[in-house]
Amino acid sequence: MSQRQVAYVFDLNKCIGCHTCTMACKQLWTNRDGREYMYWNNVETRPGKGYPKNWEGKGGGFDQEGKLKTNGIIPIMADYGGRIGDFNLNEVLLEGKADQVVPHEKATWGPNWDEDEGKGEFPNNHSFYLPRICNHCSNPACLAACPTKAIYKRPEDGIVVVDQTRCRGYRYCVKACPYGKMYFNLQKGKSEKCIGCYPRVEKGEAPACVKQCSGRIRFWGYRDDKNGPIYKLVEQWKVALPLHAEYGTEPNVFYVPPMNTTPPPFEEDGRLGDKPRIPIEDLEALFGPGVKQALATLGGEMAKRRKAQASELTDILIGFTNKDRYGV
C-alpha cells in the first residue's frame, strides 16, 4: 500500500480537444523503441469507440465481490491503428518495387479516428472530449493479475509502475486493465504504461500532460491535501467523479462532467425542447449516479457568480495560476 496517493481532476467543461497533452506525452515517452502505437495519454470524442477501439467492452477489472475478472481480452493491433510507422521503405528505396511510400497496412482505426463525430444528427448532434491516462488505481487490476509481481505502487505517491526487469511479457496485465491503458511493447517483449512522469514528480515538476495543458483543465496533487484542489473538488464539493467506478479498481483520475450549456435539441416542430443536449444517462453511464448532483452543484455556483456573488468552487475550477491547479 502507498503512504500517499497523487490524483488528477480533469474539467471536461474546459477541454478544447487540442491534444497538446497527448503530444507532450508522446514526445517525452512513446515516440520510439516499439512504443510508436502507444498513446499513454489520448483525448477521445464521446460518444465514441475510444482508443483502443471499443475499450469499454474489453473486460477486466473486478466483479462485485472484489474478485479479479478473467474475461479480459488483449486488443489486436488493428484496434490501435495497425503497425504505426511501418512503411514500405525497402520496396521503394532499395528494391525499386514501388514508387510511393505507403504504410504496409491500411489503417482502419486510430487514436483520433472518430474525432468530433459524436452522436445524433444535425442540428441535434452532441459530443464532448474525454482525456484519458492511466488511472493509477488504488486497487489496480493490472497489479493483481501480474504473476511475476512486476507491477507495484510507489509508496511515496501511489503511482503504478512496471518493473521492466521482472516483467516476462505474459500480458495478463493487458487483459486485466478494463481501461485499455496497459500496452505491450512488441519490440522489447515487455508491458509498458503511463508512469505518471515520476522522474518529473521527484524533481517537484507536474506531469508533462498536466503542465502543457492549454485549456488548464488538469488539476493534480495529493488526495489527502485538504488545501489542494483535488481534495476540494473530489471530497468537499463532490463535483469530480471517477470514470467507470463499477470496474472496481478505485481510479485516481476524476472528471468534472460536462454541463449542458449549449441550446437544447430541437423538437420535430422546430421549437427548442426542454431536454439536455447531452443526455444525462450518457454521462451517468460514464461517471455514475453522482452526475446529477455534481451538475446541480456546478449550476448553482455558476448562478451565484452571475449575481456577482463569491464562489470558492468556480475560483478553484478557473485555476488562475499553476500553483492553484497543482503541486505536491
Curated annotation (Swiss-Prot):
Q: Which residues bind [4Fe-4S] cluster 2?
A: C25, C194, C197, C209
How cofactor binds (record note)? Answer: Binds 1 [3Fe-4S] cluster. Binds 3 [4Fe-4S] clusters.
Q: Where does [4Fe-4S] cluster 1 bind?
A: C15, C18, C21, C213
Residues where [3Fe-4S] cluster binds = C146, C167, C173
| Application notes | Has potential use in bioremediation of waste sites contaminated with chlorate, such as pulp and paper industry wastewater.
Q: What is an annotated GO biological process for this record, any one? A: anaerobic respiration
User: Start and end of every 4Fe-4S ferredoxin-type domain?
Assistant: 6-35, 125-156, 158-187
The cross-references to InterPro entries, in alphabetical order and at most eight, read:
4Fe4S_Fe-S-bd, DMSO_Rdtase_II_Fe-S_su
Q: Name one GO molecular function term.
A: 4 iron, 4 sulfur cluster binding
Cofactor(s) this protein requires: [3Fe-4S] cluster; [4Fe-4S] cluster
Mind telling me which SUPFAM superfamilies this protein's record contains? Answer: 4Fe-4S ferredoxins
Keyword Chloroplast in the entry? The reply is no
Main site of residence? periplasm
Q: Where does [4Fe-4S] cluster 3 bind?
A: C134, C137, C142, C177
Q: Does the keyword Metal-binding apply?
A: yes
* Keyword set, alphabetical order: 3Fe-4S, 4Fe-4S, Electron transport, Iron, Iron-sulfur, Metal-binding, Periplasm, Repeat, Transport
Function, in words = Electron transfer subunit of the terminal reductase during anaerobic growth on chlorate.
- Name-wise, this protein is Chlorate reductase subunit beta
What is the name of the gene encoding this protein?
clrB
